[in-house]
Curated annotation (Swiss-Prot):
Membrane topology: Multi-pass membrane protein
InterPro entries linked: NADH_UbQ_OxRdtase_chain4L/K (IPR001133), NUOK/Mnh_C1-like (IPR039428)
This protein's name: NADH-quinone oxidoreductase subunit K
Subunit structure: NDH-1 is composed of 13 different subunits. Subunits NuoA, H, J, K, L, M, N constitute the membrane sector of the complex.
Keywords: Cell membrane, Membrane, NAD, Quinone, Translocase, Transmembrane, Transmembrane helix, Transport, Ubiquinone
Similarity comment: Belongs to the complex I subunit 4L family.
Species this protein is from: Hamiltonella defensa subsp. Acyrthosiphon pisum (strain 5AT)
Example of a GO cellular component annotation carried by this entry: plasma membrane
Length: 100
């Protein structure tokens, strides 16, 4: 069995990588992938904690995280398609420009 500290350290590293990718990248596809990594790292922390204490709650929260990630991906991809159709780019900075 993997010690709890190792699983939580791995989850923290993955969350940090996802947060870094979310803050640094300006492409919407990379931002969605980074957000998925962050959601999965939080779910990993729940599973590790649940397996350490012998409760199935971590696995239940993992199922919740999977459904949340699926909803986030579908909404994000719909926004991505609309952004590309209107502006012919996937750069998120285009959305912050004001029309005048």
């Amino acid at each position: 069995m993997i010690p709890m500290q190792h699983g939580l350290i791995l989850a923290a590293i993955l969350f940090t990588l996802g947060l870094t990718g979310l803050l640094i990248r300006r492409n919407l596809i990379f931002m969605l992938i980074s957000l998925e990594v962050m959601i999965n790292s939080a779910a990993l922390a729940w599973v590790v904690a649940g397996s350490h204490w012998g409760h199935p709650d971590g696995q239940i929260f993992y199922l919740l995280a999977i459904t949340l990630a699926a909803a986030e991906a579908s909404i994000g991809l719909a926004l991505l398609l609309q952004l590309y159709r209107r502006h012919h780019t996937l750069n998120i900075d285009i959305l912050s420009e004001m029309r005048g």
